[in-house]
Amino acid sequence: MMQDLRLILIIVGAIAIIALLVHGFWTSRKERSSMFRDRPLKRMKSKRDDDSYDEDVEDDEGVGEVRVHRVNHAPANAQEHEAARPSPQHQYQPPYASAQPRQPVQQPPEAQVPPQHVPRPAQPVQQPAYQPQPEQPLQQPVSPQVAPAPQPVHSAPQPAQQAFQPAEPVAAPQPEPVAEPAPVMDKPKRKEAVIIMNVAAHHGSELNGELLLNSIQQAGFIFGDMNIYHRHLSPDGSGPALFSLANMVKPGTFDPEMKDFTTPGVTIFMQVPSYGDELQNFKLMLQSAQHIADEVGGVVLDDQRRMMTPQKLREYQDIIREVKDANA
């Protein structure tokens, strides 16, 4: 929008300047033609009385009406001679007086000159002063000059447009749209989870059934539902089950007579939420697993059957807290 406004202002200014130049040129031509047209003829020499001095009057390129000098044929009359002398002073007009075309109409000084003293040959001298005044010929040389005036008007905006053309690529580069990060959706909190530990024999060996049974009973497990062992709230087997122990080999069940029984390991698991404090139950579960591993000569593994580490224990605790918060 601003570029279009500036372009319009430049075009209007160019038109105004060209109009002023054409008007000034036309006025100068008009004044110059009027000056050459009104240039008067050389004045005729007049001889005056023997007592007066002869003077040659000639306008130095004066522009104005031709003066008519009176020729006195009666030199004897001194009074008339003296009265006629001041008349040329009144008839004298400065050269710039004729610049105004209508001033020759006013001729009060000539009325003071008696008509009897004005010679007849002076009349044709006045005719060329009035003949070159028609205004129609002045318009003819001016009219063809006005016609080419619109041509520079059309050419003037061209440099202006060229001046604005390089301004287009100067536009500031738009910043690339920055993709807003998608809102991070909070993971739904777990409503329940299963914490799993394993007690396994060393590589290439198995756990003895009789030693395993004694260690399980010492840890407070009691054989029960689904043919697996459970750790209840009370050591005598009363109360809800806190966590359970199953065989690592499918189907995961046990035979109560475990004298001739061997296995590569057992799995201890706890469902969360559970009865009581889940974190306290988890500590009790970890202690039971360590006790059984010490008794049978095995190791405690995580749910991926890797060595249990402090980081994995903290991960189990975080899961328990998450479930507790989800069910709070």
Swiss-Prot record:
Q: Does the keyword Cell division apply?
A: yes
Query: Matching CDD domains, A to Z?
Result: ZipA
Q: Please give the start and end residues of each transmembrane region.
A: 7-27
Q: Which UniProt keywords apply?
A: Cell cycle, Cell division, Cell inner membrane, Cell membrane, Membrane, Transmembrane, Transmembrane helix
GO BP terms in the entry: division septum assembly; FtsZ-dependent cytokinesis
- Do you know which InterPro entries this protein is assigned to? Cell_div_ZipA, ZipA_FtsZ-bd_C, ZipA_FtsZ-bd_C_sf
| Pfam families assigned to the protein according to its UniProt record, in alphabetical order | ZipA_C
Region feature Disordered, mapped onto this chain: 42-186
One GO CC annotation: plasma membrane
Q: Which topology term describes how it sits in the membrane? A: Single-pass type I membrane protein
| Keyword presence, Amino-acid biosynthesis | no
Bias (Low complexity) ranges: 100-115, 123-171
Its annotated compartments are:
Cell inner membrane
Q: Which residues lie on this side of the membrane: Cytoplasmic?
A: 28-328
Periplasmic-side positions: 1-6
HAMAP family associated with the record: ZipA
What the protein does comes down to: Essential cell division protein that stabilizes the FtsZ protofilaments by cross-linking them and that serves as a cytoplasmic membrane anchor for the Z ring. Also required for the recruitment to the septal ring of downstream cell division proteins.
| Quaternary context | Interacts with FtsZ via their C-terminal domains.
The protein's name is Cell division protein ZipA
